[in-house]
């Protein structure tokens, strides 16, 4: 095989594996955005969010929760992917993901990171707890409403007549 044939073969192999990777990521997006997955994850977080505290110390109780989450969510996602891609191999995909992590949308990668990175998992729970307790990110102080009318003397009733 000469150099040109090798390059062509490598390109077609690369393109096929890239297309396969892109297809899996597309399916992952569909699965993660699906109401069934959202409900599964929300129910799990509702069950355990009060266990998590925003401290440097990680409680021993976090470990079984983390393991249960991995088992539940990873199993669900793998089953969904197997329905869409017969013969799908999660371990092989995870390896490929490490090489393509810059190409994956942030929210997808962050969610996948919760399977392997305990701190990402804990942060997800802390964010959820803050949201449940009304301590979520408040952007209202940064919002300013400005009238688009040139004259501020136009009354509300006159303004309504214009629309």
Curated annotation (Swiss-Prot):
Together with ARL2, plays a role in the nuclear translocation, retention and transcriptional activity of STAT3. May play a role as an effector of ARL2. Gene3D superfamilies: ADP-ribosylation factor-like 2-binding protein, domain. The lineage of its organism: Eukaryota, Metazoa, Chordata, Craniata, Vertebrata. Keywords: Cell projection, Cilium, Cytoplasm, Cytoskeleton, Mitochondrion, Nucleus. Belongs to the ARL2BP family. GO terms for molecular function: transcription coactivator activity. GO terms for biological process: maintenance of protein location in nucleus; positive regulation of tyrosine phosphorylation of STAT protein. This is ADP-ribosylation factor-like protein 2-binding protein. It comes from the Eukaryota. Interacts with GTP bound ARL2 and ARL3; the complex ARL2-ARL2BP as well as ARL2BP alone, binds to SLC25A4/ANT1. Interaction with ARL2 may be required for cilia basal body localization. Interacts with STAT3; interaction is enhanced with ARL2. Found in a complex with ARL2BP, ARL2 and SLC25A6. Found in a complex with ARL2, ARL2BP and SLC25A4. Interacts with STAT2, STAT3 and STAT4.
């Amino acid at each position: 095989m000469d150099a040109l044939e090798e390059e062509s073969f490598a390109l077609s192999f690369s393109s096929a594996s890239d297309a396969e990777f892109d297809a899996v990521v597309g399916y992952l997006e569909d699965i993660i955005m699906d109401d069934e997955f959202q409900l599964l994850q929300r129910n799990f977080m509702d069950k355990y969010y009060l266990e998590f505290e925003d401290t440097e110390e990680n409680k021993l109780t976090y470990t079984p929760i983390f393991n249960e989450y991995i088992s539940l969510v990873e199993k669900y996602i793998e089953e969904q992917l197997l329905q869409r891609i017969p013969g799908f191999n999660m371990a092989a995909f995870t390896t490929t993901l490490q090489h393509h992590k810059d190409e994956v949308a942030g929210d997808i990668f962050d969610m996948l990171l919760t399977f392997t990175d305990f701190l990402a998992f804990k942060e997800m729970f802390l964010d959820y707890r803050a949201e449940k307790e009304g301590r979520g990110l408040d952007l209202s102080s940064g919002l300013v409403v400005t009238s688009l009318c040139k004259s501020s003397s136009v009354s509300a009733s006159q303004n309504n007549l214009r629309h």
